[in-house]
Amino acid sequence: SAGLQMDVFELLTAVFATEDPDFSLAEDWEETRRILGRYPALDRINRTDFLTAVSLLVTSRAGHAAGQREDILNLTLADYLHARRELRTTFLETAEFLSQRCMLTIDQVPYTAQLIPLAVIFARLADTPRALASTKAWDKLNQWFWCGIFGELYGSAAVINRSARDVDQVTAWIEGRTEEVPKTIRDASFSESRFFSVRENSGVYQGIYALLMARGARDWRTSQPFDRWTFPELQPGFHRVFPQEWCRDNGIEDVVADSVLNRTPMGKRTEVVIDGYAPTRYLSRVQTKSLLEDSEFDTVLGTHELNTDLLYQSDFPNFLRDRRSRFLGMVEYAMGKPALRD
């Protein structure tokens, strides 16, 4: 009826039914959903996202990637089946890519929208033997990925055009067909002030949390790395180094106390030991639980991009200043370009 507009999935279902009455797009999607369901990080990939990926892949091979509604509706059943088979594989490769960067659950993925072009880029690069066989190629892919996150370029509603452009430009750049840096990398900029304004629902917040873990941060109590094998046991979160109560008692503004600069990955049982105390008090308690020697414990603390001496002294202003400088370097390295020091 005129009152109920069919979504693109329902329209394509009708299109495919004219080609093959026995084919059910809904049943086919359920099988795709089951395959992607092996990885919690892919939980927000919906059926329209998947059709967008199919369209981007098919059109990019034909000349230029496109993933708008009309592009999806131009797909033939043969186009769909061929691309769907590849994308079921490359979405799993995308989940592995995320896992290696310590993004294991849906809450840890900065932008689900960025996973659509990433899966398509993996499929396109598979057309070229050994396209990802060099460190340089992976460096390029990493740079694009982190620029998308810290530039917050996949956080808006209008990402289809960016996705299409990235599929074409990033693929060509990694394959060495062009020296031109993709527009997403050129567009990306990170302002230092974002350290104080991002909150839990932000891609930058999740990006910094993941980057700390991926760069080797270890749990203070167990000295274990945060990875797919230790996650179920550690149940980590991005917790405050200087607890909220301590910050309030010491006149620290909430905007500073709540910032990512005052957060670090901790296992659930580590965070419990902290219990509102200053580092000067809680560090000895954590170390006792860890059974580590002084030098070993200091090494573990140091994996968190922080100055251990300032932490032991509970010197919050200098701790924050030092960590801001370290975090800035970390973000600039990931993006491959300088940040705005505002």
Language model features by range: what are they?
Residues 1:
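Duplex nucleic acid-engaging cores and interfaces of nucleic-acid transaction enzymes
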Residues 259-288:
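Short Cys/His-centered divalent metal-binding micro-motifs
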Residues 4-193:
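A cross-family structural signal marking well-folded subdomains
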Residues 149-238, 246:
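Intrinsically disordered, low-complexity N-proximal targeting/linker segments that flank membranes
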Residues 69, 129-130, 153-154, 247-250, ...:
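Short conserved micro-motifs at the rims of enzyme active sites and ligand-binding pockets
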Residues 121, 125-128, 144, 148-151, ...:
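Hydrophobic alpha-helical segments
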Residues 294-342:
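C-terminal, well-folded lobe of enzymatic/effector domains
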Residues 228-262, 275:
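Histidine-centered nuclease catalytic patch
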